[in-house]
């Protein structure tokens, strides 16, 4: 396997997230305590880190028991820049811009944000006729939704070049007001018209439909103009600022296949994979091998917790299910995947520099140690060394926080089990977007 040429930045950029608690007045509710995650204005990488944290909160494969998130996200950002696991349908990239356009016509910062919330609630209501399972964000919560579409798509809009205004929605609203005031104080200039047309977003965005979002038949069907714009933006997106990772943007090649993909098709089976550049195919092969090899570590972790739970009233059938699943995985594991991870995981680690993810030496050491043990093949489930390695890793990550299920019975008592999931690098979102686009010629 040829060496992968990956742009490596000097130093690792850690995501500086802030968690705050404040009291705010909510119309109709009075004073409420709100807990929120924020990011540093003007730094898109911090925005992306917040949304990754939000996306991980409800996903089985993103619990971070074994600390593989930085490697996973490095692959995902490289293959599918601008996408996230909490996005649902492609047309939201335009819905959010249009809601912001409507809201930005207000004259004050707080008025803009209040109007944005109102328009997004109207959007939820307008789409609710589509029913469950169609990707409608907030269909159950409606106006009680805590994570609006603008929060979910904000970072992606920047990555795709569809948002020019940097920073959070608050920073954007502040910028709209400031720009409008500047133009008003400049006699003889016609800049306000430009502000009114862009509002910090793509000046070439498709025109907002009349009466949006209050349309009786609003749905996720893209118009020809919307599909053309989105294809161009998705194809041009890149995970690093230097553009060296652009060759690994899978959407640029996958979108040339203008047919709907069947449900359940894996990333590895996309019909355009053979058309990828050689280096991209090699990187994709490494990502697949990493998924298959580390999947077993997730099963072993669950088997270990289930075994420790047995004297505490845990379910025997749960333990036996994990044990059987681990053996099935070990029997099917391909030695070629093990060797690929052992030989090339450092190259994947260098993606972290380019995509601004912190991949610690401890993470790479754990992956290498696990892969080395995987050479035992079908005998691995009986390996005490493998169980000890996985247990030590979880304790190292969670022990100080008091959430280690290996160490604490109290943490095990709150455990609901669940199946280990293979990493898919946001393929679920990409699969849906490709089908959204395939229906438009």
PLM region descriptions:
Residues 15:
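Short polybasic linear motifs
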Residues 18, 22, 26-441:
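Non-catalytic recognition/regulatory regions in large multidomain proteins
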